[in-house]
């Protein structure tokens, strides 16, 4: 480990204004301190417009400045920390649509689609070294952009029963647009290592009173292990699918609430790698017991359906 520390402070102020019933505007200003260094003032502007009350169709957009100090792990982790890292900074633009509809006591349906575009200087990324461990470094210029889509459907087919479905998909190219570090550098114009371009997930949850059964499926597209994006045996990691299931039970007592959870991870014993030469576990089992004390009196009994 390492014996390092620093004081971190942050402050945020925002102003919100609705000139009309349908239009909303917001400006936020943030500033942070890490150790003895302050970030510049970090502004953000947000707007939303209610296109239609039917279905609660809303258009949203924002522009924000990005500024990120390296974490203590980035700087000092052993082995691999890099105390010479620069700070990330840049701008992000996004826009999207969202909707929400439903019928009380029967179902709710929500969804959103967002386009984003980020231009980041000195992007911090951890990459493998010739010594066998990872170390962070700065990528001079990165253009990260893409589309994110999310949807949620909750159905109550009968009393005490609830079916909850969540789905998401992301297309997120992250391209190195910096300068060549040497004449042989082939990383410019290529996807960043270990960043999948496509990912998706689907979660289904069936709840009955204090019981819940959950199935989660996830997909990650191929990832390159080298900045040159070479299609060699060790130059990329293949796509993989993952399935997990779990059964939960909530118990309620006067002094505490107890959550019991039994999970089967990697249900179909998928062979996959998140990092080159480091195989991930096959099918494995997990038992979780969570205890939440109750402080005060007259606590309402409720079923916590969050994982």
For each of these PLM feature ranges, what is it?
Residues 22, 51-57, 102-109, 156-163, ...:
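Short loop/turn motifs that connect adjacent beta-strands in outer-membrane beta-barrel proteins
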Residues 50-52, 58-60, 87-145, 150-160, ...:
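Membrane-embedded beta-barrel scaffold of Gram-negative outer-membrane proteins
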Residues 18-22, 115-119, 138-225, 257, ...:
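Gram-negative outer-membrane beta-barrel transporters
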Residues 219-228, 238, 244-307:
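C-terminal beta-signal and adjacent terminal beta-strands/loops
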Residues 25-27, 43, 57-61, 93, ...:
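Transmembrane beta-strands of outer-membrane beta-barrel proteins
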Residues 7-9, 29-35, 63-69, 76-78, ...:
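Transmembrane beta-strands of outer-membrane beta-barrel pores
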Residues 2-118:
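Structural signature of Gram-negative outer-membrane beta-barrels, strongest in the C-terminal barrel
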Residues 3-9, 39-41, 89-93, 141-147, ...:
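Residues that define the transmembrane beta-barrel architecture of outer-membrane proteins
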């Amino acid at each position: 480990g390492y014996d390092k520390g620093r004081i971190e402070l942050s402050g945020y102020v925002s102003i919100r204004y609705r000139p009309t019933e349908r239009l909303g505007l917001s400006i936020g200003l943030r500033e942070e301190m890490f150790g003895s260094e302050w970030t510049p003032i970090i502004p953000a502007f947000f707007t939303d417009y209610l296109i239609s009350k039917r279905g609660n169709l809303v258009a949203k957009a924002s522009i924000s400045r990005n500024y990120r100090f390296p974490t203590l792990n980035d700087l000092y982790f052993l082995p691999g920390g890099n105390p010479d890292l620069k700070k990330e900074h840049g701008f992000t633009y996004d826009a999207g649509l969202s909707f929400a509809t439903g019928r009380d006591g029967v179902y709710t349906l929500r969804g959103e689609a967002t386009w984003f575009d980020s231009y980041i200087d000195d992007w911090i990324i951890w990459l493998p070294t010739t010594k066998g461990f990872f170390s962070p470094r700065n990528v001079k210029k990165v253009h990260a952009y893409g589309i994110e889509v999310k949807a949620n459907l909750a159905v109550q087919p009968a009393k005490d029963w609830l079916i909850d479905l969540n789905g998401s998909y992301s297309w997120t190219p992250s391209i190195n647009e910096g300068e060549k570090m040497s004449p042989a550098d082939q990383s410019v114009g290529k996807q960043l290592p270990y960043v999948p371009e496509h990912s998706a997930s689907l979660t289904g949850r069936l709840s009955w009173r204090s019981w819940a059964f959950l199935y989660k499926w996830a997909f990650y597209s191929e990832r390159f292990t080298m900045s040159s994006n070479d299609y060699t045996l060790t130059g990329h990691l293949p796509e993989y699918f993952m399935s997990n299931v779990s059964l939960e039970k909530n118990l309620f007592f006067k002094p505490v609430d107890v959550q019991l959870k039994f999970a089967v991870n990697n249900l179909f014993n998928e062979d996959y790698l998140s990092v080159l030469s480091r195989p991930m576990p096959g099918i494995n089992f997990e038992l979780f017991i969570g205890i939440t004390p109750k402080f005060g009196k007259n606590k309402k009994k409720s079923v916590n359906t969050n994982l």
